[in-house]
Amino acid sequence: MATFVSELEAAKKSLSEALGENVKQYWANLKLWFKQKISKEEFDIEARRLLTQENVHSHNDFLLAILTRCQILISAPEGSGSLNSATKPGKPKGKKKISSVRQKFDHRFQPQNPLAGAQQFVSRDPQEDDELKLCSHTMSLPTRGQLEGRMIVTAFEHGLDNVTEEAVTIVICALEKHLKDLLTSVVSRRKAHRLKDGHFRYAFGCNVNPQPYLRNSLAAYNQLIECPPVLSSPTGTPNSGTYVHPDDAEQQAALLLACSGDNLPASLPPVNMYDLLEGLQVHREVIPSHTVYALNMERILMKLWHPNREELQQDEIHRQRLAAKEGLLLC
């Protein structure tokens, strides 16, 4: 992995020297290409415009280094490292057999079928090529290689040289934690739940619901002993007072069942955009950044909006006028 990192840094340094004062414009175009706001052909045209004819190879070498770095992260196993290289217990450690140059050459160069890598012609929808392959369209989390490529572009834009694997792992964990917080805020608005220590939510949608017509129903839920404080015991064991006695737990369960209603809560429909909108409006602390919060709320409101019949007709007329100007015929 260190070899590919050094190759990427060397390619970046060579490209920066070739660009000179145009390096900021190149990073901006690279960011637009990663966001798929411009095509690969447009990005290559802008790169050739910023570079001289003798330095165009620096652009190709840099892109090849980035793609190689991201591809190595995807193809490498998750648990590869120093832990896997340790010798297994119970097996004698033998001498490592040194392979000859002939064996290495035969292993690397194997005869292949030239038609194996040929492109297969499959009938596709013409609109599929115009779709952006972003997370909002694929409905899936970005892969490790895609995320590192995006982080490398952002790091180069802010003057950093490289991105470590630990930083990519931290961003992936932070993304998963953020999505879990969003789901918790939405589910907590749909179904009842209990609190532990005043902040930890659990038991979402439990079958035992309180009976509002009983006077002691609310008190039974408020006085529920979940984690009693540690009590000093004469034996000196610290864990003797950290658990609830089975008789007390059975009495609490019987009281909750007696104070609960006869009917189970009705099943709810699947989570929709209205639930997400309500969850973010109530729990605004889930997205601390005001800019990100405002953009996401705008996207949610746009998803909830649908054009009426008149707007659809006006849009069709506008498309026909554009097609007439370009000399195209609509079917």
Swiss-Prot record:
Single Gene Ontology MF annotation: transcription coactivator activity
Subcellular location: Nucleus
Main location as per UniProt: nucleus
InterPro entries reported for this sequence: Hfi1/Tada1
Ranges annotated as biased composition (Basic residues): 90-99
Renumbered residue ranges of the record's region Disordered: 81-102
A Pfam family it matches: SAGA-Tad1
Gene Ontology cellular component annotations, sorted alphabetically: nucleus; SAGA complex
Keyword field: Nucleus, Transcription, Transcription regulation
CDD domains assigned: HFD_TADA1
Listed GO biological process terms: regulation of transcription by RNA polymerase II
Described function: Probably involved in transcriptional regulation.
Family: Belongs to the TADA1 family.
Stated name of the protein: Transcriptional adapter 1
Organism: Xenopus laevis
